[in-house]
Amino acid sequence: DMIMTHTQIHRSKWQRAAFVLLLGSMVQTAFAAVINVSAQDNLNDALARAQAGDTLKLASGTYNTKLYIDKPITIEGPADRSAKIVGDRSGRTIAVHAPDVTLRNLTVSNSGLSLPAMDAGIYLEETAPRALIEHTNVLDNSVGVYIHGAAESMVRENKIVGEATLRVNERGNGVTVWNAPGAQVVDNDIS
């Protein structure tokens, strides 16, 4: 009694494949952790412990460090942007080298000041497509956010203020976009 047509068999295979993919994404989401980090904790240690898909929730305070992000994670501070990631005035304060990274509700400052070295508060490498930078203060950097080939990235609703001590021709842009198809810069306050 159970005779299936070629179309029904083909459809059944696709339905099973779709179910397996959906189940796999739900399992990955189910195992994503929220890691609470205080200003007294070592933020780089927390980043090293985080797994792909995890969220680092930063408490208010100052985190004197630079970050190299090499896995798809979210780093999120309080809505008032009182989690401050402060660089040491060399290089990039936050360098993102993984896809699907989100930075939200932070204050990022004190990158290096070399335009030729592409110093920036937040630097998105081409290996970091679909990055999302939102609701973040990016202050006192050479370049605020540098999208260096990170396709389909979004920089939205941020406040970006350049390093005022530099002469105008030594200052970088609030946001620089280079070779990043689909990148969007939307509703930012840049000065």
Question: What are these regions, as identified by a protein language model?
Answer:
Residues 1-13:
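N-terminal secretory signal peptides that target proteins for export/translocation
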Residues 44, 48-52, 63-76, 84-129, ...:
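Extracellular beta-strand-rich solenoid/capping regions of secreted or surface-exposed proteins
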Residues 27-45, 60, 78:
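Right-handed parallel beta-helix/beta-solenoid
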Residues 72, 78-82, 100-110, 129-140, ...:
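Right-handed parallel beta-helix
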